[in-house]
Amino acid sequence: MMKKIDVKILDPRVGQQFPLPTYATSGSAGLDLRACLDDAVELAPGATTLVPTGLAIHIADPSLAAVMLPRSGLGHKHGIVLGNLVGLIDSDYQGQLMVSIWNRGQDSFTIEPGERIAQMVFVPVVQAEFNLVEEFEATDRGEGGFGHSGRK
């Protein structure tokens, strides 16, 4: 059985004036989040702003979290990305989903009411347990890090 997450609608325009978040295709991982604004917001180059989504969430299950990610078209075409690059929503958070938007482009960008501004993906969570050790069991890779396997 598929797990369902309770997402509360805080703004009555969501589902009326602004469409409910949906998965675009059966293979979509992310839900589009929309700007729940009264009026358009002009974002100057280099500026950031917090934009409400009109949605609140309480995941409640500590084995799950959600991440907010930029929409690829906004970033590539207009330089519009998330101000914090990725937004993490912990399972015990209960507030409205706000999106930090950063205009890293060269031109002003206008965020229109109801515009799709980010996407949200639910992900499993594994918490680390720390154990003090003196050494690891050796592997073929060892301490090989950045670029250790070459480019081809």
Curated annotation (Swiss-Prot):
Catalytic activity: dUTP + H2O = dUMP + diphosphate + H(+)
Cofactors demanded by this protein: Mg(2+)
Molecular functions per Gene Ontology: dUTP diphosphatase activity; magnesium ion binding
Range of residues in the leader sequence: none
Keywords, in A-Z order: Hydrolase, Magnesium, Metal-binding, Nucleotide metabolism
Positions annotated to bind substrate: 71-73, 84, 88-90, 98
Protein family membership: Belongs to the dUTPase family.
Described function: This enzyme is involved in nucleotide metabolism: it produces dUMP, the immediate precursor of thymidine nucleotides and it decreases the intracellular concentration of dUTP so that uracil cannot be incorporated into DNA.
Name of protein: Deoxyuridine 5'-triphosphate nucleotidohydrolase
Source organism of this protein record: Citrobacter koseri (strain ATCC BAA-895 / CDC 4225-83 / SGSC4696)
Lineage, highest ranks first: Bacteria, Pseudomonadati, Pseudomonadota, Gammaproteobacteria, Enterobacterales
Gene responsible for this protein: dut
